[in-house]
Amino acid sequence: MFDILIHGGTIIDGSGVTRFKSDLGIKGDKIATIGDLKNQQAKRIINATGLIVSPGFIDAHAHHDGVLLTDPQHASGLRQGVTTEILGQDGLSYAPLSKENYKMQRQYLSGILGLPPENLDMSSVKAFRANYHKKVSINTAYPVSHGALRMEAVGFHDIPLTGKTLEHAKSLLSEGMEQGAVGLATGMSYHPNAWSTTEELIELCKVVAKAGGVYITHLRDVNPDRGYGGGGIPEAIEIGKRSGVKVHFSHTRTSAENAGKIDEVLELVDQGKKDGVDCTLELYPYPTGSTFLLSSLPSWVHEGGPDKIIEKLKDKTTRTKIIDALALNTKRPLHDCVLSHLPNNPQFEGMTIPEIAEIKNKSIGDLALDMLIEENLQVGFWLSPPTNIAAWRQVSKDCMEFLSRPDYMIGSDSIPLGSTPHPRAYGTFPRFVGRLRRQFDVMSLEQVIQRAADNPAQRFGISKRGRIQEGYYADIVIFDEDRIIDTATYDDPKQFPVGIPYVLVNGSVSVDQEICTGIFSGYAVP
């Protein structure tokens, strides 16, 4: 007898091959049998007639490290069909960190990760993974946080890793890889990551390469103080060449400013591949992104960590210098920022900085810094979408063209904090699998599922997931290919998709007729 029998569905197995009609039997946390099972018994039978049965989606880039620890149900991801997430992105995470450094990092990252419990053990990758294993609704994978390594080696300071400090970081990284990390994640536009040198990264990536892991990088592309040229791509390629590590580029896509220029975006990556660097990429299917307001401050302000930052924000002379620097930041202009997460001022969530500044009779620079002080740095924002509908449509089409490449995968870059988060937190996967697939008809549904499931599983070494196959874990999403669609918008972002009635995680029904069941069956993987 099976624990669960999925009857009458059409299976898309994730490998890219043509769909086929079949039943599927589950025992425990694994797929036991695929075939004609109409005469078989099961404790639970799910009628999937007229529906697609596919592997659960794997979110290749999510910022849920903190949120999952305060909201383990994680409906915003689960209702999209996401069964596994790669955490630790952009080097912005919590392990390995001592108690004191975790406390500091917890506050520093509160605008992007929220505030997880203060008493957690984050001293190693093993300890980090234990905080999630069978305690949250989805599976989690973790690349070692570059920011955490730097904090443990030299504190929150603009100091290069050399000699003993570099060896200490390499030792922590090696231990993390042995404890199940899938690689090393850096955010070269964020701190303390941005203070690293290319040589430091090459040495760290030699450790990752030896362990078979992946170098996951958000490039040095939006930090005006530490730019590299070429959007940071040449640095990542150089690291791949000299260390032998596999390179994964985070959210690589066009925007309203360069819509349609796909070849221009990928030229340096493709040249790196020709030169022998193993590269993959990922994106989210929206024209603008979101992050935490603290990250927009100039590099020197971050020196010393959160308490020192707040001191600088309050000092009149230093404050003026910061505001002058913010006025020059064209990558994240304050006038385009919609504040999405303000725990102490929720009445202003969903409003732009200029709108709030007008209400408070302040300049936009003063308003931004005052909000950081009032919120103890816990401020999130997203950039306003383009008003040019043609540019928006072109960016959406570009996303599908990018994703038609076999080296691409999908990652939400989700930050589900506040009352008005970026809509990608609730809509990324049904937008890709449903809305944009139907609108642009660039890929078959089989190819779409491969990008959403098997590609990230293969890239990050997540074994026995990403496909519907006997002996694989029963991470499964059942959906209507004609109805699946996102409903989250910039104006009304906390809206769940439709057309996804069932989601299973490790053989447990986690979404049942579009309702989350409250089962925490997620594993720390691989």
PLM region descriptions:
Residues 40, 47-119:
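Metal-associated gating/positioning segment near the N- to mid-region
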